[in-house]
């Protein structure tokens, strides 16, 4: 305020001084923030009347001319005439790259790992100066998640109108969209043809994991022939999407290698699944920690199977070795078949907030990941490492992490898992290393 000299006195006694202040603030390298949820009550004419030809109100016309004269170059270079191309004009997007992100719904960043990934990439694109639009395939304004995106600066398309007319919106604005980021095969397949038809955008496909690989592994575990057919169907769909996109990304080198084995020509690269900018060094105090934890959203079948295997094959033997042990099962939407597994030693807690989850990471001695099948890098493993909590996992849980053998304890058979976990739980030197 002092650096720019407050309000410009050329706008005395009133009108345009606030707009001028915003332009001056930007000129000096700062940002002007707009809060769309604020409410302004304005009684037109109460202060200075409504006649722009006399009295104080006349300064409204006079000062608009002064404002235009002062900022003529800025307005010509970075703004558009009134009512011309509002899609580009709003958010001062004349020179911004516009990116459309598509997923199944607005990211529930505190409920599942995939949503956390999408949310963090949205943050990245906004911070990089993109004008970001978001379509959730269910077109529902889940809260508080929709508000969180809007406060970030993301335009979210939701409601019955967009559910019915999203193709019209894409056709009308597609010429300005430079990038389209499609998530998950079952969602991307609905949108990629329209994106190609109505835009010239570079299309990025992010698969999260390989569905065909996950279902093939589940078939190998269960022998369910329907899963083998489903795996073949997914492989066809996923390869079509990968080859149709300009670039496909996955969260680890495992998916990259698997795709290149069956489609060497595919443009596929591994990128980080998570973007943590606030990683703090964590102190591990053995005596202040106890018990075990498992975190996973239960809309994901491998997590349900993991808890069932834990309860039926691991817990009985583990409790014999560690009678006072408690295992906290955390994660959204646990089904009845999981809730019914609860015992004195196995506590089904369900959904926890990010703050509560961090407390579990900081208070539990070990985070366990007893996954028997799945595909892709596991967010629960990366998250535990972020908080400095030791991890006991299967090889499925360790997949995609280079050097996993040196930083994780890994066992695949129930008996081996119990032996290693019980020994690790009591080994202070190993846990604090």
Language-model-detected regions and their locations in the chain:
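Acceptor-binding helix/loop patch of EC 2.4 sugar-transfer enzymes
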Residues: 108, 201, 205-232, 257, ...
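Conserved catalytic-core segment of nucleotide-activated headgroup transferases in glycan assembly
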Residues: 110, 114-119, 123, 134, ...
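Conserved donor-nucleotide binding/catalytic region of nucleotide-linked donor-dependent transferases
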Residues: 423-433
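Short hydrophobic beta-strand element within catalytic cores of glycosyltransferases
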Residues: 380-384, 390-394
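Acidic donor-binding loop of glycosyltransferase active sites
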Residues: 176-178, 246, 362-376, 387-389
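C-terminal, non-catalytic tails of nucleotide-sugar-dependent glycosyltransferases
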Residues: 27, 31-32, 49-98
């Amino acid at each position: 305020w002092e650096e720019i000299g407050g309000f410009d006195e050329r706008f005395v006694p009133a009108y345009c001084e606030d707009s001028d202040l915003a332009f001056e603030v930007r000129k000096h390298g700062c940002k002007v923030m707009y809060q769309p949820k604020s409410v302004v009550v304005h009684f037109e004419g109460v202060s200075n009347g409504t006649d722009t030809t006399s009295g104080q109100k006349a300064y409204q016309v006079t000062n608009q001319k002064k404002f235009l004269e002062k900022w003529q170059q800025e307005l010509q270079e970075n703004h558009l005439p009134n009512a011309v191309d509002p899609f580009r004009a709003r958010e001062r997007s004349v020179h911004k790259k516009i990116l459309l992100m598509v997923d199944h719904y607005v990211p529930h960043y505190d409920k599942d790992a995939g949503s956390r990934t999408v949310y963090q990439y949205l943050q990245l694109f906004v911070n990089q100066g993109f004008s970001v639009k978001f379509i959730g395939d269910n077109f529902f304004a889940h809260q508080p998640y929709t508000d969180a995106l809007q406060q970030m600066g993301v335009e979210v398309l939701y409601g019955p109108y967009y559910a019915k007319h999203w193709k019209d919106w894409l056709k009308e604005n597609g010429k300005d969209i430079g990038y389209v980021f499609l998530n998950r095969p079952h969602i991307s397949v609905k949108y990629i043809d329209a994106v190609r038809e109505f835009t010239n955008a570079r299309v990025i496909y992010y698969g999260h994991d390989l569905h065909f690989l996950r279902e093939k592994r589940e078939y190998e575990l269960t022998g369910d022939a329907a899963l083998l057919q489903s795996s073949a169907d997914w492989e066809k769909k996923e390869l079509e999407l990968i080859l149709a996109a300009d670039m496909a990304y996955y969260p680890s080198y495992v998916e990259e290698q698997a795709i290149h084995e069956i489609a060497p020509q595919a443009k596929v690269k591994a990128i980080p699944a998570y973007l943590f900018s606030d990683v703090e060094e964590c102190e591990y105090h053995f005596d202040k920690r106890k018990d075990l934890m498992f975190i996973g959203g239960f809309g994901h079948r491998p997590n349900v199977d993991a808890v069932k295997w834990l309860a039926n094959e691991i817990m009985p033997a583990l409790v014999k070795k560690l009678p006072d042990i408690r295992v906290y099962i955390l994660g959204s939407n646990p089904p009845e078949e999981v809730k019914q597994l609860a015992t004195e030693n196995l506590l089904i807690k369900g959904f926890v907030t990010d703050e509560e989850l961090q407390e579990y990471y900081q208070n539990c001695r070990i985070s366990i990941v007893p996954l028997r099948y799945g595909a892709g890098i596991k967010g629960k493993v990366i998250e535990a490492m972020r908080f400095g909590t030791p991890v006991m996992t299967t090889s499925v849980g360790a997949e995609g992490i280079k050097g996993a053998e040196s930083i994780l304890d890994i066992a695949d058979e129930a008996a081996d898992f119990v032996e290693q976990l019980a020994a690790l739980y009591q080994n202070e030197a190993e846990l604090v290393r």
